[in-house]
């Protein structure tokens, strides 16, 4: 792809709401700019004040009546607003950070399927028919996209096609694995033995209370164990109560700048990730880059080299045994697969 490109990245969230999609959008923008192209990131923050909260308001109203299809409506109204206010005929390339906000255009485009809502409802009690209705709408959404659709790992693609959507997807889905700036991980620091760390949202999908129950067993076995939790979310109050109840040596750092996250990772020894669902996991990637030994559920749809020790279930004793019993060094992995440059090049190439 020759010449200087004008690229617009559309992200259907707010800049201040951190997470994997937000990180990806910003990494893409900086990576594209570093290659000499022009890149603009459009978020809900860029909409007129009276409209920027409309997608989330519509989502809540529709979900109150017809849960969980409100997520589809949120994507639809976001797409309409972005198209009205930010569609540019002089752009060379459009990147949509979600299938729900993607529209067909004569401009070269790609839609990124980080995950689908029907696979991200762990915090809710969803009836089978409700889930089926949402899946059907998502399948129709994907089939209506005329430009390439990519997802973030081979494992997640296999899960979506053969399991989640039960081979009902007719569209070809490509894979572009995510990448991050690895510069700050090159610094080596002395790791504190028995120091465990977790980074991510404190929400149902991340299974944070299970992590605390596992840590309680570890601490009762060896009082040298320490746990640092980086992140925030709706499960924080429950986590604080559990920590106080059992007087555990757990540090809750909340949301902190990314540079500080990296510094924390570099000084810990073990990364324990008790999430029940992932399609890639920046957190596991960063833990590997920082040289930590990683423990995670074997059923996650992440690159296999992200997990050093896999646990096949969510039995507390099995996690305890795995962490106590596995004293091997972290496994080596090819970090060159997960650079921003490679991610940008693959993304632009897929869109033609």
Regions found by a protein language model. Give the residues of each.
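Membrane-proximal helix-turn-helix segments that form the acceptor-binding/catalytic region
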Residues: 128-150
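Active-site proximal beta-strand in glycosyltransferases
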Residues: 93-95, 104-124, 150
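A charged, aromatic-enriched C-terminal amphipathic alpha-helix characteristic of glycosyltransferases
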Residues: 314-318, 325-352
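Nucleotide-activated donor-binding/catalytic signature segment of Leloir-type glycosyltransferases, i.e.
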Residues: 240-256
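Carbohydrate-associated surface elements
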Residues: 155, 179
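Conserved donor-binding/catalytic core segment of Leloir-type glycosyltransferases
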Residues: 150, 187-206, 212-216
């Amino acid at each position: 792809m020759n010449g200087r490109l004008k690229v617009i990245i559309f992200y259907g969230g707010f800049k201040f709401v951190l997470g994997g999609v937000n990180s990806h959008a910003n990494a893409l923008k900086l990576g594209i700019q570093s290659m000499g192209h022009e890149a603009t990131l459009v978020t809900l923050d860029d909409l007129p004040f009276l409209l920027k909260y409309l997608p989330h308001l519509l989502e809540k109203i529709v979900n109150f009546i017809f849960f969980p299809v409100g997520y589809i409506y949120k994507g639809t109204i976001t797409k309409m607003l972005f198209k009205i206010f930010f569609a540019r005929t002089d752009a060379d390339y459009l990147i949509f950070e979600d299938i729900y906000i993607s529209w067909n255009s004569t401009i070269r485009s790609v839609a990124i399927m980080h995950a689908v809502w029907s696979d991200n409802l762990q915090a809710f009690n969803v009836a089978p028919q409700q889930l089926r209705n949402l899946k059907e709408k998502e399948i129709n959404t994907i089939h209506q996209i005329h430009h390439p659709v990519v997802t973030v790992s081979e494992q997640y693609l296999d899960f979506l096609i053969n399991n989640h959507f039960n081979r009902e997807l007719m569209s070809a889905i490509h894979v572009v694995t995510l990448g991050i700036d690895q510069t700050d991980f090159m610094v080596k620091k002395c790791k504190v033995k028995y120091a465990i760390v977790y980074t991510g949202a404190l929400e149902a999908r991340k299974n944070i209370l299970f992590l605390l129950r596992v840590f309680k067993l570890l601490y009762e076995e060896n009082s040298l164990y320490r746990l640092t939790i980086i992140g925030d979310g709706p499960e924080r109050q429950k986590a604080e109560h559990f920590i106080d109840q059992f007087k555990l040596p757990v540090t809750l750092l909340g949301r902190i700048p990314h540079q500080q996250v990296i510094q924390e990772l570099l000084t810990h020894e073990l990364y324990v990730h008790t999430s029940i669902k992932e399609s890639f996991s920046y957190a596991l990637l960063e833990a590997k880059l920082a040289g930590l030994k990683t423990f995670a559920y074997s059923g996650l749809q992440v690159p296999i080299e992200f997990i050093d020790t896999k646990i096949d279930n969510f039995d507390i004793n099995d996690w305890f045994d795995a962490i106590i019993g596995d004293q091997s060094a972290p496994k080596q992995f090819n970090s060159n697969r997960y650079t921003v440059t490679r991610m940008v090049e693959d993304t632009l190439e897929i869109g033609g």
